[in-house]
């Protein structure tokens, strides 16, 4: 038997805890998911990161990134190497991810202090819908526990932006940063500045594109796109502004290759349009079309970490 608690009920039972954000993003086409957690403290986030990585389950990678704990996983169920923390077992882990309509069910295991994390901390985060507990649930001490945490099904949307400035005024990275911060739809995840080919003849100065990513409900994507388009339209100083839109957790390899090559190769707009069409990227002309190369490249480079911000010579 189980019992169910809402976040406010968990908070009332255990007192206020530390989880500031908890998002479950899914990419059902590729059978993968990503769990993003914002924690108030560096210590518990780092401990959870290494233990979840060691415990395996459905996790394929766990890392700290941009102040967030990011967990890549496969949709389904996996075997846990779970127990007191030591070389071959971890004290906290994710056993299963299931998509149930508009919700995602994640099954967590924790022991001792880690049971508090999965039983009291995450479940009281406002991003959680409800948590299901077994009747014999106990946390802390030496207790081992498991729970099912149910959250809204979210998807990742990347919005690339280029050519919003002139030699007199403007900065594309500022436009996209403001757009992400002020967007009322979804949750802002990351902001990137993507270095393009410094030898591009039509550059402003540094020749950079930019992009932001969001966690959003699928039915809210049209509203997100509408907000981004109109925000950029009001903020741009250029007649050649383009935004691009990509949904998913896996940027296609051909799109990544194009993005990287834009750091050293000079392309025509039609090249970028073709790559976009072949790889599921929506291109939106805001005030023109010359910005399409950078806006497509920004999506391609989005998951490259520091490499997105540099030129190839920086990494030789």
What is the predicted function of each stretch?
Residues 1-316:
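Conserved mixed alpha/beta catalytic, RNA-binding, or beta-rich assembly cores of soluble enzyme
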């Amino acid at each position: 038997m189980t019992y169910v608690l809402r976040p406010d009920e968990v908070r009332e039972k255990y007192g206020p805890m530390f989880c500031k954000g908890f998002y479950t993003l899914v990419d059902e086409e590729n059978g993968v998911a990503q769990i993003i957690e914002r924690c108030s403290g560096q210590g518990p986030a780092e401990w959870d990161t290494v233990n979840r990585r060691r415990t395996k389950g459905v996790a394929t990678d766990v890392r700290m990134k941009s102040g967030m704990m990011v967990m890549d996983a496969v949709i389904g169920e996996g075997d846990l190497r779970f127990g007191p923390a030591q070389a071959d077992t971890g004290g906290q882990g994710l056993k299963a991810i299931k998509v149930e309509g508009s919700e995602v069910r994640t099954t967590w295991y924790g022991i001792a202090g880690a049971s508090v994390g999965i039983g009291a901390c995450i479940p009281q985060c406002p991003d959680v819908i409800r948590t299901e507990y077994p009747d014999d649930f106990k946390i802390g001490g030496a207790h081992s526990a498991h729970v099912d945490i149910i959250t809204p099904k979210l998807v990742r949307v990347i919005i690339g932006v280029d050519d919003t400035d002139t030699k007199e005024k403007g900065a594309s990275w500022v436009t996209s940063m403001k757009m992400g911060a002020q967007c009322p739809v979804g949750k802002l995840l990351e902001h990137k500045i993507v270095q393009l080919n410094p030898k591009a003849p039509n550059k402003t100065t540094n020749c950079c594109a930019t992009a932001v990513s969001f966690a959003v409900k699928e039915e809210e994507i049209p509203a997100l796109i509408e907000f981004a388009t109109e925000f950029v339209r009001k903020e741009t100083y250029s007649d050649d502004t383009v935004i691009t839109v990509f949904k998913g957790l896996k940027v296609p390899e051909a799109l990544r290759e194009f993005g990287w090559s834009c750091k050293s190769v000079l392309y025509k707009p039609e090249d970028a349009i073709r790559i976009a069409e072949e790889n599921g990227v929506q291109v939106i002309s805001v005030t023109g079309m010359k910005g399409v190369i950078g806006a497509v490249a920004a999506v391609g480079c989005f998951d490259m970490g520091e490499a997105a911000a540099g030129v190839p010579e920086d990494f030789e």
